[in-house]
Amino acid sequence: MINFPSIFVPLVGLVFPAIAMASLFLHVQKNKIF
């Protein structure tokens, strides 16, 4: 539990932008289709 933040913080720092980019990409693709 002591090392949890040192693993959790970089993980969120990488996963959150990846999800944001993926959702933005899908949103743009959906707008292009329709």
UniProtKB/Swiss-Prot annotation:
Membrane topology value: Single-pass membrane protein
Biological processes, Gene Ontology terms: photosynthesis
Cell compartment(s), UniProt: Plastid, Chloroplast thylakoid membrane
Major place of residence: plastid
Residue ranges of the TM segments: 8-28
Domain of life: Eukaryota
InterPro entries: PSI_PsaI, PSI_PsaI_sf
Keywords, ordered alphabetically: Chloroplast, Membrane, Photosynthesis, Photosystem I, Plastid, Thylakoid, Transmembrane, Transmembrane helix
GO cellular component terms given for this protein: chloroplast thylakoid membrane; photosystem I
One Pfam family recorded for the sequence: PSI_8
Family classification: Belongs to the PsaI family.
Function: May help in the organization of the PsaL subunit.
Name listed for the protein in its UniProt record: Photosystem I reaction center subunit VIII
